[in-house]
Regions:
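Active-site helical microenvironments for divalent-metal-assisted chemistry
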Residues: 1-287
């Protein structure tokens, strides 16, 4: 169906608005560089002193390896591995995972050999970093295959689960800053994220990361649809939120009367989940 001139203008305006939002987010310090050495150290308060010293050495190595390199947002490149490490610190991952996050791009982007990492940080950390680099190769050789095949291959060829966790954190920060890329590259990476990385996060039970990857991917690939559903959800939220709270309290009262100590929470479906359900059932939002 051909669009009218007015519809074309509205479509272009809406897409421009969403692309501007993506770019603004990507270039902001809060998103592009959310973590620095000081805040990372604070987030790693669960580690002991020896482990923190090793993490600090990994950071210094990464800072030197990426010296002079910059992200497309203009931020020093080291802000990216710091952000990836910050995601894993929030998950209370072990110090080897944090070190690998800080070092995850030095093999590909800085011309450093794996043997150097082995000598500097041990074989365990070097293997994680090497595994993260190899995951990208697995994707490139499996791009034409079904998404599920890639997921199975990634899981099967990765002996250490921490490799996948570092890669997911890497993809999450890249998706948060995807607005710095040109439109075609944005859409390709966002499509990869929806097809491959979000399902892997789901397989691992990492629901919060899965949802964020899906939302970021959805609004990048389908900005107009994301906007329409987002506005519809906002318009309906008031009444539905009150109804959900009423139902929650009723269930809680019944449980209490039966002597069952429980916590009842309500959960709103996120935009991509609503979209996939509408698409599968061929229904509109109102249905």
């Amino acid at each position: 169906m051909r669009l009218s001139a007015l519809e074309m203008i509205e479509k272009t305006t809406s897409e421009s608005y969403f692309q501007a939002q993506l770019a603004a987010r990507a270039f902001s310090d809060e998103i592009a560089a959310p973590t620095n050495a000081k805040t990372l150290t604070k987030a790693l308060s669960y580690l002991n002193r020896r482990e923190l010293r090793r993490v600090r050495r990994a950071y210094q190595f990464a800072e030197e390896a990426h010296d002079g390199q910059r992200r497309l947002s203009g931020h020093p490149y080291v802000t990216h591995p710091l952000a990836v490490a910050g995601v894993l610190a929030d998950m209370h991952m072990d110090h080897q995972s944090i070190m690998a996050a800080l070092l995850h791009d030095v093999l590909e982007d800085s011309g450093i050999d794996k043997e150097v990492l082995v000598e500097s940080f041990g074989e365990e950390v070097a293997d994680i970093v090497d595994g993260v680099s190899k995951l990208a190769t697995i994707y490139k050789t499996s791009a034409e295959e079904h998404a599920e095949n890639f997921q199975k291959m990634a899981m099967a060829t990765t002996q250490d689960l921490r490799v996948i966790l570092v890669k997911l954190a890497d993809r999450l920060h890249n998706m948060r800053t995807i607005g710095a890329l040109d439109r075609d590259k944005r859409r390709r990476i966002a499509r990869e994220t929806l097809d491959f990385y979000a399902p892997i996060a789901n397989r691992l039970g990492m629901n919060a990361i899965k949802i964020e990857l899906e939302e970021l991917g959805f609004e990048t690939v389908y900005p107009l649809r994301a906007g329409l559903i987002g506005r519809a959800v906002s318009a309906a939220r008031g009444n539905r939120k009150a109804l959900m709270e009423e139902i929650r309290k009723s269930i809680l009262a019944v449980l209490k009367r039966e002597g069952i100590d429980a916590t009842v929470v309500g959960r709103e479906k996120h935009l991509y989940s609503i979209y996939t359900k509408m698409k599968a059932q061929r229904k509109s939002f109102g249905d």
